[in-house]
């Protein structure tokens, strides 16, 4: 959430920036959506990780969270994702003005065996052999089916939304908050598994069938790029004070993502390379992201040096912005 709303990577490493009082005053592009109603939906409590602290930066935000719904919680995270989506749809279909909404789901988290609402009997669990699950990064059937249930909930949301007038003029954006450390060797080179890059790898889908043509793109992007891209698609004039970029602006093509780990590493992922540094002791490594990339030792040293400098500069800039990207008056 912090990265999406502020355009700054959460570079604190060992503590969420939303838990740091000095980091809560943040400028966000959401406030440039003038004349838009603004909504936030969460099936549980916004006090978790102090989500509500960062959300206070959004002017006129209408919160729909724990205690707002007639449905009963199914686990510690609150009501089911399906119910949350359908509650949001009830609000959206009543709107007469443009709106910006953030729906934060939580079903694809532990406890996986409690993620699926009992009343959703049309969702059929699938049994898979442990070896097959492991080959594709899943630890057990509960995790696999919770992942599938996320798709089911999105399907129910889209089916409901398509019946309403707002659907044809709305840009839906789906993104994961983080991935899962698992075996990815069936789909990606070994480095993805060895370096736990699956932890950082999430889908990003822009869906607006009446506004956007269908295409699949492979470049490296990150959560900080989402708001500038949405604003660009909506033709909103906005002030960008941080590090995100409009992914559809062909004049700003420089594909990379800065990533951090609670193990004490920072790194930079490009379309071709992954550079990683351990900040606890002097260790830097460079990996190729694809099996077809071949470099000489001299080329590797040059690339590592360049990415090392870039990573250092980006890390320090992100830390500065976390404390200095003030909302203003």
Predicted stretch roles:
Residues 1-329:
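Solvent-exposed soluble domains appended to multi-pass membrane proteins
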């Amino acid at each position: 959430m912090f990265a999406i709303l502020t355009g700054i990577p959460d570079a604190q490493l060992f503590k969420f920036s939303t838990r740091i009082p000095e980091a809560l005053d943040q400028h966000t592009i959401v406030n440039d959506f003038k004349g838009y109603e603004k909504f936030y939906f969460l099936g549980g409590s916004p006090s978790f990780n102090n989500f509500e602290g960062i959300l206070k930066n959004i002017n006129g935000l209408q919160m729909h969270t724990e205690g707002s719904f007639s449905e009963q919680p199914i686990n510690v995270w609150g009501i089911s994702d399906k119910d949350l989506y359908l509650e949001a749809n009830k609000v959206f279909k009543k709107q007469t003005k443009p709106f910006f909404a953030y729906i934060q789901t939580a079903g694809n988290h532990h406890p996986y065996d409690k993620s699926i609402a009992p009343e959703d009997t049309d969702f059929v669990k699938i049994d898979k052999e442990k070896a097959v699950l492991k080959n594709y990064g899943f630890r057990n059937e509960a995790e696999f089916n919770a992942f599938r249930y996320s798709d089911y909930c999105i399907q129910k949301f889209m089916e409901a939304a398509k019946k309403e007038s707002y659907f044809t003029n709305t840009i839906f954006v789906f993104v994961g908050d983080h991935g899962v450390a698992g075996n990815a060797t069936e789909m990606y080179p070994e480095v993805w598994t060895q370096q736990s890059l699956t932890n950082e790898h999430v889908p990003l889908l822009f869906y607006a069938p009446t506004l956007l043509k269908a295409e699949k793109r492979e470049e490296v992007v990150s959560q900080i790029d989402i708001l500038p891209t949405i604003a660009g698609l909506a033709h909103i004039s906005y002030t960008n004070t941080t590090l995100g970029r409009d992914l559809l602006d062909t004049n700003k093509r420089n594909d990379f993502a800065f990533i951090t780990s609670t193990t004490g590493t920072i790194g930079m992922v490009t379309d071709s390379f992954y550079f990683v540094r351990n900040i606890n002791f002097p260790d830097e490594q460079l990996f190729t992201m694809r099996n077809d990339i071949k470099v000489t030792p001299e080329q590797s040293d040059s690339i590592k040096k360049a990415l090392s400098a870039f990573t250092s500069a980006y890390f320090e800039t992100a830390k500065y912005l976390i404390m200095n990207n003030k909302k203003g008056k």
